[in-house]
Swiss-Prot record:
This is Small ribosomal subunit protein uS7. SUPFAM superfamilies: Ribosomal protein S7 (SSF47973). GO terms for cellular component: small ribosomal subunit. The gene is rpsG. Pfam families: Ribosomal_S7. One of the primary rRNA binding proteins, it binds directly to 16S rRNA where it nucleates assembly of the head domain of the 30S subunit. Is located at the subunit interface close to the decoding center, probably blocks exit of the E-site tRNA. The keyword Ribonucleoprotein applies. It comes from Aeromonas salmonicida (strain A449). One of its GO terms (biological process) is translation. Keywords: Ribonucleoprotein, Ribosomal protein, RNA-binding, rRNA-binding, tRNA-binding.
């Protein structure tokens, strides 16, 4: 943490094709080894697959999928007198998006389709329908928070 001043959050440029900041952030999450053009090709390919498969607006499906994955609460470990408690805390909006995108990409990488674009499209469509591994991950996190609701007073 800086001692002098709070460092401002760097403004992310919107996506060149659709003009969406959220999609630009998602392209960055998909990116591996700094290969942004490859990442963009994967994401745009996935959106094209979504448009042909579902017949709906691909950006709307993307937004809906992220909405279904975003966690409201998560648990954080808090040590109190020799015991470690899993304390449920509310997730900040920026972290909600970051977690949703990370879970979505992780779930897509574990799928069985041939190309990454197909995996991503499949996971996005599943998430939009409230199915898939990424939605299950969100449910697991919410379940953990619900189970540890008794320790909510340890919040910091």
């Amino acid at each position: 943490m800086p001692r002098r001043r709070v460092v401002g959050q760097r403004k992310i440029l919107p996506d060149p094709k659709f003009g969406s900041e959220l999609l630009a952030k998602f392209v960055n999450v998909v990116m591996v080894d700094g290969k942004k053009s490859v990442s963009e090709a994967i994401v745009y390919g996935a959106l094209d697959i979504i448009a042909t498969k579902s017949g709906k607006d691909h950006l709307a499906v993307f937004e809906e999928a992220l909405d279904n994955i975003r966690p409201a609460v998560e648990v954080k470990s808090r040590r109190v007198g020799g015991a470690t408690y899993q304390v449920p805390v509310e997730v900040r909006p920026v972290r909600r998006n970051a977690l949703a995108m990370r879970w979505l990409v992780d779930a897509a990488r574990k799928r069985g389709e041939k190309s990454m674009a197909q995996r991503l499209a499949g996971e996005l469509l599943d998430a939009a329908d409230n199915k898939g591994s990424s939605v299950k991950k969100r449910e697991d996190v919410h379940r953990m928070a619900e189970a540890n609701k008794a320790f909510a007073h340890f919040r910091w």
